[in-house]
Every structure is written in structure tokens, then in C-alpha cells.
């Protein structure tokens, strides 16, 4: 009887140790997988267009892609403010020093994963326009960093170009171009494009997730959308009501 109890105790101890070792192994594996995903080489092959596709593209107007900044392409926080979504000690991609109301403020800016690659690809398909509800002194500095002397983010609109309605800033796309059939807006805030929901592609807000792939997931759709004669024929299908990316 005593030997049986000792045997059972030994088995329980062995299983307990094995379980802890396995849990630790899984923790290390997940940690390394996140690192691999974060720094993996990204490709989106742009194949030559067929004659039919080329003719189709030549028959329609070149589209405009309007891009929001905060929580769409980047996330930032300023001196003394660290949102719980940003892991303490996470280094920013760049730091901006701006003067607001005569007070110097430092912004610590984190770029959404794959944003540089995303901009490089979509700039070949669309005219890119920045439209942010942020102040110009901040938004312009962020856009300069994302542009990185490539000349792809030349047109920019800021808070003064928005309409203030019930405490929210609304982006009027007719300010960008009068022909709304050729304008697409990518914004994490549905309220910002509520005047033009049929021109919008929704995207989930981004704060700190290093494994986020929302921008990459959008590339096939944006690639196809440029061939349409009116983007609203596709985007009007209630995409703004769903968090697809």
C-alpha cells in the first residue's frame, strides 16, 4: 500500500514538473515566433499587367487614396503620457519635437508594422493624400518622417480642413477632390468619414501589436479597387460596418 502511494506521488510529481517544463517551452516558442513574425521579410509581388488589364486601367481615372495617421499608420504619445497599450520600454521609431502654444512637446512615435512597405507599394497605384484631424505642426512632421524624402505624401490636410460637429472632426473628401468616384479613405475612425461611408475602407485601430498585418491584408483589395470606374460600387456594400482588417 505504501509503495503504491509513493508510486502515485512520484507520478504526480513527474507530471507536475513535465507540465511546468512544457508551459515554459511554449512560452519561449511563442516569444520567438512573435519576434520572427515582426522582422520577417515581406513581399507582395507586383506582376506585369496583361494587355486586357492594362487597357482597363488606362480607361479609368487614377484613384486617390486618403490616409489617416494616428492609430491607422502610426501611434504616438507625448511626454509624461504612456498609454497602457504601449509596453513600457518599447523604443519609438522616431521622436518629434514640436512647439504647441509656446510649449515644447516631444512625441514618441511608433510605426504600424509594414507601413513603409505598404506606402511603397500603394504609391505606385494611387495618388496618396494625408488627411489627419491632428494639428498641422504635428501632422506635417509625422508625414515628413513617413515620406522619408520619397515625395509620395505631398498633398496633406489637417485639423483646419476638417468640420467640427458635436465635438468630432469630420473629413470632407470633397476638399480633396470633387469627383468622389475616385477617392478612397483609409481611417480607423468611422466618425471621421461618416459623411462619405461609401468611400471608406475600415481598419482596426493600432496601438502596439508587433504582429499586426492589417496593412498587408489590404494590398490585394487596393490592387483590385484601382480598376473600378467608381470605388463606391464596391465600398458601398456596408464595409464600413465591419472590422475586416
Curated annotation (Swiss-Prot):
Class in the EC hierarchy, top level: hydrolase
Record InterPro entries: Dullard_phosphatase, FCP1_dom, HAD-like_sf, HAD_sf, TIM50
UniProt topology in membrane: Single-pass membrane protein
Gene3D superfamilies assigned: HAD superfamily/HAD-like (3.40.50.1000)
Pfam families in UniProt: NIF
Keyword Transmembrane: yes
SMART domains listed in its UniProt record: CPDc (SM00577)
Domain FCP1 homology: 58-225
Entry EC number(s): 3.1.3.16
GO terms (BP aspect): nuclear envelope organization; positive regulation of triglyceride biosynthetic process
Catalysis performed (reactions): O-phospho-L-seryl-[protein] + H2O = L-seryl-[protein] + phosphate; O-phospho-L-threonyl-[protein] + H2O = L-threonyl-[protein] + phosphate
The keyword Transferase belongs to this UniProt entry's keyword annotation: no
Subcellular location: Endoplasmic reticulum membrane; Nucleus membrane
GO annotation, cellular component aspect: cytoplasm; endoplasmic reticulum membrane; Nem1-Spo7 phosphatase complex; nuclear envelope; nuclear membrane
Transmembrane spans: 7-29
Keywords: Endoplasmic reticulum, Hydrolase, Membrane, Nucleus, Protein phosphatase, Transmembrane, Transmembrane helix
Highest taxon in the source lineage: Eukaryota
Function recorded in the entry: Serine/threonine protein phosphatase that may dephosphorylate and activate lipins. Lipins are phosphatidate phosphatases that catalyze the conversion of phosphatidic acid to diacylglycerol and control the metabolism of fatty acids at different levels. May indirectly modulate the lipid composition of nuclear and/or endoplasmic reticulum membranes and be required for proper nuclear membrane morphology and/or dynamics. May also indirectly regulate the production of lipid droplets and triacylglycerol. May antagonize BMP signaling.
Name this protein carries in UniProt: CTD nuclear envelope phosphatase 1A
Organism annotation: Danio rerio (Zebrafish)
Amino acid at each position: 500500500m505504501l509503495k503504491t502511494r509513493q508510486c502515485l506521488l512520484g507520478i504526480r510529481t513527474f507530471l507536475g514538473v513535465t507540465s511546468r517544463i512544457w508551459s515554459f517551452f511554449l512560452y519561449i516558442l511563442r516569444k520567438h515566433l512573435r519576434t520572427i513574425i515582426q522582422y520577417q521579410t515581406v513581399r507582395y509581388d507586383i506582376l506585369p499587367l496583361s494587355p486586357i488589364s492594362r487597357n482597363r486601367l488606362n480607361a479609368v481615372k487614377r484613384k486617390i487614396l486618403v490616409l489617416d495617421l494616428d492609430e491607422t499608420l502610426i501611434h504616438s504619445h507625448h511626454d509624461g503620457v504612456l498609454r497602457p497599450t504601449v509596453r513600457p520600454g518599447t523604443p519609438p521609431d522616431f521622436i518629434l519635437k514640436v512647439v504647441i502654444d509656446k510649449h515644447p512637446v516631444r512625441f514618441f512615435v511608433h510605426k504600424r508594422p509594414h507601413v513603409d512597405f505598404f506606402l511603397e507599394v500603394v504609391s505606385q497605384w494611387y495618388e496618396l493624400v494625408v488627411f489627419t484631424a491632428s494639428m498641422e505642426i504635428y501632422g506635417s512632421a509625422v508625414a515628413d518622417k513617413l515620406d522619408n524624402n520619397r515625395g509620395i505624401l505631398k498633398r496633406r490636410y489637417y485639423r483646419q480642413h476638417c468640420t467640427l460637429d458635436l465635438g468630432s472632426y469630420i473629413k470632407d473628401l470633397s476638399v480633396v477632390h470633387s469627383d468622389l468616384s475616385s477617392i478612397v479613405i483609409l481611417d480607423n475612425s468611422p466618425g471621421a468619414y461618416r459623411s462619405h461611408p461609401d468611400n471608406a475602407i475600415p481598419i482596426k485601430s493600432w496601438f502596439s501589436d508587433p504582429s499586426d498585418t492589417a496593412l498587408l491584408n489590404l494590398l490585394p483589395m487596393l490592387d483590385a479597387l484601382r480598376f473600378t470606374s467608381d470605388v463606391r460600387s464596391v465600398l458601398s456594400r456596408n464595409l464600413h460596418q465591419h472590422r475586416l482588417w
